[in-house]
Amino acid sequence: MGASGQITNLEENGKKMNARNSSFDYAVAAFRAAPHLGVSFGLVPFTTMGYNFNASGTTTLGNETLKSTNTYSGDGGLHQVYLGAGWQPVKGLSVGANISYLWGDITKSVVLSFSNASVSTLSKNYSASVASYKLDLGAQYLLSLSDKNKVILGFTYSPKHKIGGNPELVTSTINTNTSVVVSDTLSGNGLRLDLPDMYGAGFTYNYDNSLKVGADFTVQRWGKLPQPTFASDNSSTSSMQYGNYLTRKKLTLGGEYCPREYDRIFVRRVHYRAGVSYATPYYKINGNNGPKEVSASLGFGIPIVNSMNNRSILNISGQWVRQWAPGMIKENTFRINIGLTFNERWFMKWKVE
């Protein structure tokens, strides 16, 4: 299980501000159910969203120039609970699958207000509620080059499918002087949210169970999916339109070094870790590609040693993430991740002599 806390620095046109938040990351368990068969289950966030910012400008109405402010906010996300199994049909080859239940709510809003209170405030509130499933498939092969040198090759695939959500848009006109609100709800039977085809491939090199280095490359084909779109002219029309998403690609490199996992000297049992990644955007903002992302992390796996257990690990890492795109807000995030890996003896067979 694990949790994280982060500080994000936002920068635009020379102006900066900081935002802080924390989150629960995961709770996962795995065990051997039978020879060559393993089972895993857990609760993990699938998506999270949270923002609130505004953009100011001027608007001319008749002979009057007014200050206008667009306030953007978003909240919610999808949760994921899964059950998985892995099987080794022959030596070196393993295959597995996870079936997940996804649920959650997503809300986004844009509010346009003016400096003159006699001018009505306009708001658009978008919402979707998801209850669906997700399927993940995987395979890996362990290649033994020698007693101390091993290579693991892996591949994952998640098929695309419709997850529904019943997207809905509520537009409102608010007269701030009279407090009169006029609202209109837009929806459509053909509107939905989708998950794309997702592919992943990678390898890990393992030297004497001491040095491990690896790379992963993933592709999420968002660019092949339509997006529920509501007419911008406030008419009651909606449709599924292509061109708002992009195919996302991500490359991750990482390594771990543990001098001697079962050495009597404590510092030799610590796991030292490092990694970097680069990802392209998966969406467009006002017709322009969204922010790219780079990250780097350093961490430690500290053994927890007591009379009953010497295999559990306290995992601590620091991560820096930068997101940027020309003409958009730049984000620099520093994140602290803390996790516990319990390797308990729950399924050990006791022998009585």
Task: Please report, for each region that a protein language model flagged, where it lies by residue.
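Subset of outer-membrane beta-barrel
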Residues: 1-353
